[in-house]
């Protein structure tokens, strides 16, 4: 069967400590080809966010809590497009896609659970986006 390549690294082997606030510039310097990666999440308590983004100049803060098992972070590194966002041309690293989801290759790893939806069975995933000021 065809499957996505899976590498599971201990957090200690990553060049970023995701349990500490790290400027996005620092992350992109350490990952010059950008992010397009799946990060496993610990816990699924919607009262405890798994991701926090802060912008100190404006004082904006966004947290995300989800019942999903992972989160994909995709930076727009190398992405150039002929359209504008907020009056500025789209350019590399202008955005960050945040995608709470189950593991992309979960169908080949039954130990991670299942995304199969039997007929007439309800399945719910929740994601909470909270916006505040610092």
Where are these regions (language model features)?
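Short, small-residue-biased leader/transition segments that mark boundaries at the very start
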Residues: 1-4
């Amino acid at each position: 069967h065809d499957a996505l390549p899976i590498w599971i690294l201990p957090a200690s082997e990553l060049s970023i400590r995701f349990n500490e606030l790290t400027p996005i510039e620092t992350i992109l310097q350490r990952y010059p080809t950008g992010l397009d990666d799946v990060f496993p999440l610990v816990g699924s308590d919607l009262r405890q966010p798994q991701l926090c983004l802060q912008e100190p100049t404006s004082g904006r803060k966004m947290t995300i809590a989800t019942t999903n098992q992972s989160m994909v972070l995709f930076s727009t590194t190398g992405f150039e497009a002929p359209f504008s966002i907020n009056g500025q041309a789209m350019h590399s690293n202008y955005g960050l896609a945040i995608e709470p989801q189950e593991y992309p290759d979960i169908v080949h790893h039954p130990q991670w659970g299942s995304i199969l939806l039997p007929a007439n069975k309800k399945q719910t995933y929740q994601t909470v986006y909270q916006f505040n000021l610092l």
